[in-house]
Amino acid sequence: MTNWATLWPNDRLFLSDTYQLIWFDIEADRIEHKHFKAQNSEDISMIPKGFVSFVDNRLPMCINHKGEVYIRVGSFDTAYYQKFGDLDVSDFDDQVLPPDRDFTFNKVVFGDVPQEQLDNQIRDLQSEVSILTSRNVEMNVRENDLLKKVSELEKQIRQSSHNYEKVVEDGVVLSYRKAGGLLNRMVVLNRRLVGQRFVTNQRRWENIIMGSGVHDGSSYMAFNFKESGGSLKVTFDFDKLQNLSPDDLLAMQIA
């Protein structure tokens, strides 16, 4: 495909403020959307830098080699180019224009835009604002949902790093203690808390206390029992263990 920049200079070829090349099919003060087309060129080096620096960071507009300046009005399919005037480009060479350069227009032809056209532009802009507002609301809702999910995941991660879960089976040991040279432990047997003492000379554990039954929702020290997936499970909560006071421990009953 031909790079339109190679056609410069040409009366109908214009350089826009976005460095697009604009081609006018007709010569008129007002160029409707159907009478112009644009091309994105990766190489506009053949266009003098004076023209390139003139359009840089300006309002939506375009200029040709003769200095004819057109202002872009509207957007999308309703956009058109309206001639603003003829700029003196006699010294536009391949040097970048100084930032304080003054520009002289030989003729200004840009007049008032018809009220009907202004009304159409206002409606188009209002429609765009409505669409953007709707999208912004959707994005805010989506963002809130994602933040909630992140918060839930962080909570699960914290819990998983501070808890240990195991299926309750006979013989699950919950705690050990040693007092007066005797070794004791708390286990679960037949879904009951059972205190046991180690008989040293017989090398076996014997039951000394039959405590309360364990079920979904019951607890013992830092252990919580719950039904899950058809099984009774016990969860050890490190955070809860850290927060138990001596009074809490003394008040605990297993019978």
From Swiss-Prot:
UniProt entry keywords in alphabetical sequence: Virion
GO-annotated cellular components: virion component
Alphabetical list of Pfam families matching this protein: Tobravirus_2B
Subcellular compartments: Virion
Disulfide bridge positions per record: none
Biological role: May function by interacting with a small, flexible domain located at the C-terminus of the CP, forming a bridge between the virus particle and the internal surface of the vector nematode feeding apparatus.
Family of this protein: Belongs to the tobravirus protein 2b family.
Name of the protein in question: Protein 2b
Organism name: Pea early browning virus
